[in-house]
């Protein structure tokens, strides 16, 4: 081979190895990563939007947000939960009562 033609010939580069049948691992990795990201997005959407939307829709159906029932904690409306904020003993206003003294 003369030096003049050696300049214009391309070097031999090995071709890529033939692929075997089946799914490549890079494709499996992409699907796994995208599934994980989608799961995180759905969870954050639930935390930030859907949970509040469910509360609003239940409140619009006639229940206040304090009366929402989760699971088997149903309360009989004929016998509601007593109000615990009502004092059981008489309340004394203290030493500084207006109009006395």
Swiss-Prot record:
Protein name as catalogued: Movement protein
Lineage: Viruses, Monodnaviria, Shotokuvirae, Cressdnaviricota, Repensiviricetes
Alphabetical UniProt keywords: Host membrane, Membrane, Transmembrane, Transmembrane helix, Transport, Viral movement protein
Biological processes, Gene Ontology terms: transport of virus in host, cell to cell
GO cellular component: host cell membrane; membrane
Function: Involved in the viral transport within, and between cells.
Principal localisation: host cell
Pfam families, sorted: Gemini_mov (PF01708)
Presence of the UniProt keyword Thylakoid in the record: no
Family: Belongs to the mastrevirus movement protein family.
Species in which this protein is naturally found: Maize streak virus genotype D (isolate Raw) (MSV)
Localisation per UniProt entry: Host membrane
InterPro entries per the UniProt record, alphabetical: Gemini_mov
Subunit structure: Interacts with the capsid protein (CP). Part of a MP-CP-viral DNA complex.
Membrane topology type: Single-pass membrane protein
Residue ranges of the TM segments: 30-50
Keyword Lipid biosynthesis tagged: no
């Amino acid at each position: 081979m003369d030096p003049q033609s050696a300049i214009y010939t391309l070097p031999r580069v090995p071709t890529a190895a033939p692929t075997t049948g089946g799914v490549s691992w890079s494709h499996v990795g992409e699907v796994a990563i995208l599934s994980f990201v989608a799961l995180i997005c759905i969870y954050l959407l639930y935390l930030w939007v859907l949970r509040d939307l469910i509360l609003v829709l239940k409140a619009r159906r006639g229940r206040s947000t304090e009366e929402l029932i989760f699971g088997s904690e149903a309360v009989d409306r004929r016998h509601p939960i007593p109000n615990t904020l009502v004092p059981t003993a008489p309340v004394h206003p203290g030493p500084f009562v207006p109009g006395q003294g």
